[in-house]
Amino acid sequence: MRYIKSFLLLIGITTLFSFMVPSNTLQDWRFIGDKIAAYGVDRDVLWVNGNDAFRQIKIRVTSAPLHIIDMDVYFENGEKMNVALKNNFRQGDESRVIDFPGGLRKIKKIEFLYETIGVRKGKARVAVWGKR
């Protein structure tokens, strides 16, 4: 009987902790780089340094709202991937997770075309995160 109580307690604690730890924590994501959007319509290039390869990326907009018109990811092998985001991001919003075709890919650069929303709120920061 004592072993059954101990076993049930262990199962209960394990179940409790499994709900407390998110499966997609920031620990799984690596910071790739960021850009500060100028006022109005702006095109920026984020050059990616290092030898890391990623399966997925996502972006997070902070400091001010931003309308992302277009985003292109250029890989080391010369291929290009157009990412259709066309979205208004509020301060603190994240994009969906963007999967790369073919698994692990080395990123050479990411080009953004965006427009600042609400100039009085300041310049938006666009941060790119990658997952292996």
Model-derived regions, located:
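Short, surface-exposed binding/anchoring microloops in extracellular/periplasmic proteins
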Residues: 38-68
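Solvent-exposed, conformationally flexible loop/turn segments
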Residues: 39-41, 90-95
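Short, surface-exposed beta-strand/strand-loop-strand elements in extracellular ectodomains
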Residues: 63-85, 121-131
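Solvent-exposed serine/threonine-rich low-complexity stretches and specific carbohydrate-binding patches
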Residues: 33-35, 82-90
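Transition segment at domain starts
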Residues: 20-47
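Noncatalytic modules at the cell exterior or secretory-pathway interfaces
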Residues: 53-59, 102-118
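Exposed aromatic-hydrophobic patches
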Residues: 44-49, 94-102
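Bacterial Sec-dependent N-terminal signal peptides
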Residues: 1-24
